[in-house]
Swiss-Prot record:
InterPro entries: PROPPIN (IPR048720), WD40/YVTN_repeat-like_dom_sf (IPR015943), WD40_repeat_dom_sf (IPR036322), WD40_rpt (IPR001680). Component of the autophagy machinery that controls the major intracellular degradation process by which cytoplasmic materials are packaged into autophagosomes and delivered to lysosomes for degradation. Binds phosphatidylinositol 3-phosphate (PtdIns3P). Activated by the STK11/AMPK signaling pathway upon starvation, WDR45 is involved in autophagosome assembly downstream of WIPI2, regulating the size of forming autophagosomes. It comes from Rattus norvegicus (Rat). The gene is Wdr45. This is WD repeat domain phosphoinositide-interacting protein 4. It holds the Pfam family WD40. WD repeats lie at residues 4-42, 184-223. Belongs to the WD repeat PROPPIN family. One of its GO terms (biological process) is positive regulation of autophagosome assembly. The L/FRRG motif is required for recruitment to PtdIns3P. Its main location: other. The keyword Transport does not apply. GO terms for cellular component: cytosol; phagophore assembly site; phagophore assembly site membrane. Interacts with WIPI1. Interacts with WIPI2. Interacts with ATG2A and ATG2B. Interacts with ULK1. May interact with the PRKAA1, PRKAA2, PRKAB1 and PRKAG1 subunits of the AMPK kinase. May interact with NUDC. It is found in: Preautophagosomal structure; Cytoplasm.
Length: 309
């Protein structure tokens, strides 16, 4: 998720198992552990300049970097793979791969076998990390936020991105599976994430609201009351066929945020983490019946560690 700089934050993103999150900043990069919340490391401005996007491969030494902000060292049309384990004092010694395009890169998603690179109207998928080759590419609706997520499970080839209806999501493997809707009023989607076992999906909007959907048991999701009515027209029928979130919450500051799933506190209680561009950290718990409450709050930008990444 990218955002106009607030306290120096240009974008935020969780790693694949959602145990860490990356913070791209005017001053470089910060990496945080989620539970417990602490800074794991950082790259300073001298090393990487101001950064527009950063993606971390699990908890490894590999980062995907895209330049941005007011004083970038790297281009906004290139994805650079940074290997922090490589020896060398110069930043060029750490760069091991480069993917270059003709238009700005808006998002990058990685897992152990693939890298997904998102432009405004197109998505590219490559094998990764050894000898990358393009697997496929496809057009999307206008996607100025670069919203996209790749299921971290190697057994499931799932990709999710904005649907053609405003406020909807397209969930695909080789073909469309289901359409999910966050609400009736238009809103900009900022982040989408799968749960660890792909049973749930969460999505956040520019209104600071996070919606949680059930994927494994879709009967938990709410549906339009019109679904109980008989035959309806084609436009209403498309609306009726959609599924609505089983639970939702809004962060108090109503600030744009990214969201992901935290550790489960019990069999029937799940948790969602919301990280906001204003520097705040929120943890909510929810149950299958839709109850949702905040459990923890902190300010991650006030947490500093002098260790490099």
């Amino acid at each position: 998720m990218t955002q106009q700089p607030l306290r120096g934050v240009t974008s935020l993103h969780f790693n694949q198992d959602q145990s860490c999150f990356c913070c791209a900043m005017e001053t470089g990069v910060r990496i945080y552990n989620v539970e417990p919340l602490m800074e794991k490391g950082h790259l300073d401005h001298e090393q990487v300049g101001s950064v527009g996007l950063v993606e971390m491969l699990h908890r490894s030494n590999l980062l995907a970097l895209v330049g941005g902000g007011s004083s970038p060292k790297f281009s906004e049309i290139s994805v650079l793979i940074w290997d922090d384990a490589r020896e060398g004092k110069d930043s060029k010694d750490k760069l091991v791969l480069e993917f270059t395009f003709t238009k700005p890169v808006l998002a990058v998603r990685m897992r152990h076998d693939k890298i997904v690179i998102v432009l405004r109207n197109r998505i590219y998928v490559y094998s990764f990390p050894d000898n990358p080759r393009k697997l496929f590419e496809f057009d999307t609706r206008d996607n100025p936020k670069g919203l996209c997520d790749l299921c971290p499970s190697l057994e499931k080839q799932l990709l999710v991105f904005p649907g053609h209806k405003c406020g909807s999501l397209q969930l695909v493997s080789k073909e469309k599976l289901v359409e999910l809707r966050r609400g009736t009023d238009p809103a900009t989607l900022y982040c989408i994430n799968f749960s660890h076992d792909s049973s749930f999906l969460c999505a956040s909007s520019d209104k600071g609201t996070v919606h949680i959907f059930a994927l494994k048991d879709t009967r938990l999701n709410r549906r339009s009351a019109l679904a109980r009515v008989g035959k309806v027209g084609p436009m209403i029928g498309q609306y009726v066929d959609s599924q609505w979130s089983l639970a939702s919450f809004t962060v108090p500051a109503e600030s744009a945020c990214i969201c992901a799933f935290g550790r489960n506190t019990s069999k029937n209680v799940n948790s969602v983490i919301a990280i906001c561009v204003d520097g705040t950290f929120h943890k909510y718990v929810f149950t299958p019946d839709g109850n949702c409450n905040r459990e923890a709050f902190d300010v991650y930008l006030d947490i500093c560690d002098d260790d490099d990444f």
